[in-house]
Amino acid sequence: MDFLRQCTLIQVMILAITIRLTHGGWTNFPESCVQLQPENAYDEMCDDSSLTNSNSIEYHNKLKSTKKFCILNQIKSVKTNLYRCYNISITSVCNSELSSQNLHQDYEVNPISRRDCLKHIIKNWNDENLERSLIQKSEDIYRTRCNFLKNTETKIEDYIIYQEKTESSVINADGLDSMIETKLIELESNKKLDNTVKTCISWEQGGDSRFNTLNLIALDLNLCLAKNSYKLEKCLLCYFFIGQDKWYRGEDGFMISIELSELDTKSIPKCEILWYRLYPGNLLTINQDYLAKKVQERNRGCNAVKSILRSGKAPPLENMIKYTIPLQAGYGIGFREKIEKTVYSAPLRGNLVERRNYDFFRCHYFPSKIKIVENKTHTPPINLCVYHFGKGSCHYPDNKYFISMNPVSFEENQHYPKSGQSFDYQSGLNGIRKKIKNQEYYIPDSFLMTLIYSSHTKSILEKTNITEVFRNDSNYENHTLQDYLGLFNKEDEGMRPERDLINLPNITSETEDDDTSDLNLELNKNLINKTSSGFSNDNSNVINIPSKEYNKTDIKTVGKINKTSIIINHEEKDYWHEEYNMWGLSGLSFLLLLALFYNKIKRKIKRKS
């Protein structure tokens, strides 16, 4: 009997461990959700270019035979985002007399070095708008308010980050100033590989189906991209296979290349470095075709559900859970079920009718593990503990009730396929329902994401070896990563993009008065060009810009400069404090009354005398 009891105890322990592992599966967890109108949400649902698309998964095992990667070195045309930084100094002089008032502003704009510019970009990395526009800021903090009968001089020191969108015919791997949109790079892998670098083509140019089957940014390398899209991390650096540091802002889809010598990585908060091997080794142990089939089923189901939603009907909750929750890290569309109750009235009776509907949200999704834990310091004591991928400690999400809905119940082990059995119903994103101490939680445990992330997390974090990196040039085939990085220290201006142009907006002020006269904007640009013989000065003409016709497209392009001064003389009086009008009216009234009172007293004195 004791032996049977021990066996039973072991079975119970195994079952408990199994359930705990079930809770430890991977999911795409929503954070920072903002509610959307349904039509706007439908447009963003079912993103087929997710991290786990069928092309990435079905042929990912071909990477095992790939010995070398290459970078896309030259294409016909590519859109490039360049960010440049400038220091701005604004001196405002208020001249106030009884006869006249005038505000004189002097703007000095100077280019900032690339090193300092990178620091500014780091500082503003998580802002919704990385670009700090001089046009926008000139309407608020840069506007000086003058006081009546006070001559004052104020100076403001600040900086701006200005974006330039250009179109280039060549992408250079050494273009250190370029912020290049992330491109899907593919490698022809179905031919016999030797020690030479194969052809690289862009995703859009891959007309042959053989090129459309391998996505080098999928899974292993994509986990690096996914980590960098998290707003919870200030930043993350990855040494990619082209030997450069890549700085990603994943939600915008572009990256910045920086020199190692330009920036000390220790000064960047919350950063870590992942070293990636050129040869990935064994990537997946699961059946590629099986996983690809499940992703394809999920995509078809999601589009079918979206069609039902667009028709004005409400699909069953289990189908919404199964097909619509995003697989991709970053921004995606989530939902919450709601029950709408309406009263149907008849002549002699009335019925209460319930109707299912959904609220939609745009959330920032994180591949995460979720566990139910008991924490007596929280109310209620049962809560969700979320482990985001790439972050060690768990946290308790603010919007935990976003997933604390009332879903369809599933058996706790149904969402994992049993050996030798077909897996159909739970092919998408399903969940389990667990009830603990009268508190019910829905754990959106994803079978697909569990297969993908659990197979890669450990191996990806253990890749610390520095191995060979090759440029798309046979002359660099035998160079190591350190040799390649050493090339950055060489002065090769021919490999770098032009950095001499500066785009400056026209500075104007706008008032709420519709009858405001046009601004007389005197633009005195002192263009100082540093040449071999010294400095030379240029002066531009005076430009009159109607304030109401001003828009963000009014941009002046200036040539090579080291300093630009913009002097603005405002003729309208909206720069005066509101107290000025009140003080002026009350002051004049007081003086008038005082004069009348004085004359009255003077007359009385004369009469008495």
Curated annotation (Swiss-Prot):
Topology in the lipid bilayer: Single-pass membrane protein
Highest taxon above the source species: Viruses
Keyword set, alphabetical order: Glycoprotein, Membrane, Signal, Transmembrane, Transmembrane helix
Annotated GO CC locations: membrane
Spans within the Cytoplasmic topological domain: 600-609
Subcellular location: Membrane
Segments in the Extracellular topological domain: 25-581
Glycan attachment points: N87, N375, N465, N472, N478, N506, N529, N551, N562
Protein's UniProt keywords contain Signal: yes
Signal is among the record's keywords: yes
Secretion signal, residue range per the UniProt entry: 1-24
Residues spanning the membrane: 582-599
Family to which the UniProt record says this protein belongs: Belongs to the ephemerovirus glycoprotein family.
Name of the protein in question: Non-structural glycoprotein
Gene source species: Adelaide River virus (ARV)
